Swiss-Prot record:
<dbReference type="GO" id="GO:0004867">
    <property type="term" value="F:serine-type endopeptidase inhibitor activity"/>
</dbReference>
<dbReference type="GO" id="GO:0002020">
    <property type="term" value="F:protease binding"/>
</dbReference>
<dbReference type="InterPro" id="IPR023795">
    <property type="entry name" value="Serpin_CS"/>
</dbReference>
<dbReference type="InterPro" id="IPR042185">
    <property type="entry name" value="Serpin_sf_2"/>
</dbReference>
<dbReference type="InterPro" id="IPR036186">
    <property type="entry name" value="Serpin_sf"/>
</dbReference>
<dbReference type="GO" id="GO:1902173">
    <property type="term" value="P:negative regulation of keratinocyte apoptotic process"/>
</dbReference>
<dbReference type="GO" id="GO:0005829">
    <property type="term" value="C:cytosol"/>
</dbReference>
<dbReference type="InterPro" id="IPR042178">
    <property type="entry name" value="Serpin_sf_1"/>
</dbReference>
<dbReference type="Pfam" id="PF00079">
    <property type="entry name" value="Serpin"/>
</dbReference>
<dbReference type="GO" id="GO:0016607">
    <property type="term" value="C:nuclear speck"/>
</dbReference>
<protein>
    <recommendedName>
        <fullName>Serpin B13</fullName>
    </recommendedName>
</protein>
<keyword id="KW-0722">Serine protease inhibitor</keyword>
<comment type="similarity">
    <text>Belongs to the serpin family. Ov-serpin subfamily.</text>
</comment>
<keyword id="KW-0963">Cytoplasm</keyword>
<keyword id="KW-0646">Protease inhibitor</keyword>
<dbReference type="GO" id="GO:0005615">
    <property type="term" value="C:extracellular space"/>
</dbReference>
<dbReference type="GO" id="GO:0004869">
    <property type="term" value="F:cysteine-type endopeptidase inhibitor activity"/>
</dbReference>
């Protein structure tokens, strides 16, 4: 992994740890999308606010070294961060006939604030994003509807009413939105006639019915002896993107995996040298995961404080004082079906798939971790915990 990939993976773990504390059920987010959104904020911040943001992304290596650097060196360093993120976005946003991957970022700012043209130019250059002035002071609800309409347009109308009525008001100065949408085709489709209703065990005493898909084929696979867990890599068409599932053997074994997991371990477990092609009898529930987070308290917990305070330094964004981020919303949406694409949910009576003796059984009928990784950039696009249908 390069330095950006390593930093992004560490940031992923920080985010997951905090999101998991406050979410007993499913967790699903895009570390790449959130890192990109923070990059846009860094573009407009200066001083301690910028340094704080860079530290959270593991791109700032200490306050002492920062103090002795010249202003020119600091500018050069900031530009390198944005250049790396720009290259990452360009790589993962390449057009494909086999999947849709849409990462959208937008800033909505109160129109009475004059935003610096240099900032507007840079946010367009590095992030293909724009800052749109809206009238929060006199037309907060109209502005809310405008923002929601933009979100719908970026997510194929799958994400509606991101901001509920009354969530924005005349005191709102800046809203930052990051939306991630993914839709892909499996390299090897599950057969619909093999899908059947099964119990998904939330714990040893409670279960919910799910539509369980089944496929016996060759996948990248490994068994983690010390954790009593299995990892299987499920490729999407053309193998640019794969979903990895980390499944504990025991119904209540997920906590042990999360306790032992680290950025280094995750890279090690899923490296080509650690995985091998095996015949796997894979049982995976149909998934529809949609999660929305106000990331302000989460980011504060991992070390970002001043960016959301009235003392934030956004002088790289506007010459006027008093500007600070008030809302940082993140919504991600994923559907997993037999084809891998969105489809109308339905209950099918299928045929049982018998496990051959040579097949490793990976039966995802209890809580597991999963993530979707882009091969060329070695970036984790999405990370999640599925614990409740």
């Amino acid at each position: 992994m390069d330095s950006l990939g390593t930093a992004a993976t560490q940031f992923l773990f920080d985010l997951f740890k905090e999101l998991n504390k406050t979410n007993d059920g499913n967790v699903f987010f895009s570390p790449v999308g959130i890192s990109t959104a923070i990059g846009m904020i860094i573009l407009g911040t200066r001083g301690a606010t910028a340094s704080e943001l860079q530290k959270v992304l593991y791109t700032e290596q200490g306050t002492e070294s920062s103090r002795i650097k010249s202003e020119e060196e600091e500018i050069e360093k900031r530009e390198e961060i944005h250049h790396q993120l720009q290259m990452l976005l360009t790589e993962i946003s390449k057009f494909s006939n086999d999947y849709d991957l849409i990462i959208s970022n937008r800033l909505f700012g109160e129109k009475t604030y004059l935003f610096l043209q240099k900032y507007i130019d840079y946010v367009e250059k590095y992030y293909h994003a724009s800052l749109e002035p809206v009238d929060f002071v006199n037309a907060a609800d109209e502005s809310r509807k405008k923002i929601n309409s933009w979100v719908e347009s970026q997510t194929n109308v799958k994400v509606k009413d991101l901001f509920p009525e009354g969530s924005l008001n005349s005191s709102t100065k800046l809203v930052l939105i990051n939306t991630v949408y993914f839709k892909g085709l499996w390299d090897r489709e599950f057969k619909k006639e093999h899908t059947k209703e099964e119990d998904f065990w939330l714990n040893k005493n409670l279960s919910k019915p799910v539509q369980m898909m089944a496929l016996c084929s060759s996948f990248n696979f490994t068994f983690l002896e010390d954790l009593q867990a299995k990892i299987v890599g499920i490729p999407y068409k053309n193998n640019d993107i794969s979903m990895f599932v980390l499944l504990p053997n025991d119904i209540d074994g997920l906590e042990k995996i999360m306790d032992k997991m680290s950025p280094e371990k995750l890279v090690e477990w899923t490296s080509p040298g650690h995985l091998e092609q095996r015949r796997v009898d894979l049982r995976l529930p149909r998934l529809q995961v949609e999660e929305t987070y106000d990331l302000e308290p989460v980011l504060e917990a991992v070390g970002i404080h001043s960016a959301f305070s009235e003392h934030a330094d956004y002088s790289g964004m506007s010459a006027r004082s008093g500007l600070h981020a008030q809302n940082f919303l993140h919504r991600s949406f994923l559907v997993v079906t037999e084809e891998g694409v969105e489809a109308t949910a339905g209950t099918g009576v299928g045929l049982k798939v018998s496990s051959a003796a040579s097949c490793e059984l990976v039966h995802c009928n209890h809580p597991f971790l999963f993530f979707i990784r882009h091969r060329e950039s070695d970036s984790i696009l999405f990370f999640g915990k599925f614990s409740s249908p």
